[in-house]
């Protein structure tokens, strides 16, 4: 069971991505290991965002040409999800107290990793989701193409998250 971040999904699906070949190798290994793929709601938001920002550079099949931009984006995300069949894990709509305010549980957990990991906020959120999914027995590894995350492999593994490294 593997938590796969957005850049790996995008790189796999689109031939134009510079890390396409590596991501194909990653998914071949995951299939050979019979690993289920897990994603978070953050991954879903990032998929939409990444496709919207890069839509003009992707070579799309002819049947996409009749769609307006918004429908193309939705269709591509749907196609990625249908093709890779990741399991989207529900968010816990739990609130926690933080400095006299209520914040979502996942954000509070993320704040706890800030000093240790020193990553960008979305990367921190992905890591937190993966750690939380691991605690629930859903995943046992984190898959990324992000060098900054791979460079923190030892720290992540000390937090209980095995990192798949294909660099």
Model-derived features with residue positions:
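Acidic, PIN/NYN-like endoribonuclease modules and their adjacent C-terminal/linker elements
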Residues: 1, 113-116, 127-167
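Acidic catalytic patch
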Residues: 15, 75-117, 124-128
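Alpha-helix capping/helix-boundary segments
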Residues: 8, 43, 126, 148-149
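Short beta-strand scaffold positions
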Residues: 4, 38-39, 121-124, 144
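General small-molecule cofactor/ligand-binding pocket signal
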Residues: 38, 96-98, 162-164
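Short regulatory "switch" loops immediately downstream of catalytic or recognition motifs
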Residues: 49-62, 84-89, 128-134
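Short, well-structured N-terminal submotif of metal-dependent ribonuclease cores
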Residues: 1-72, 165-167
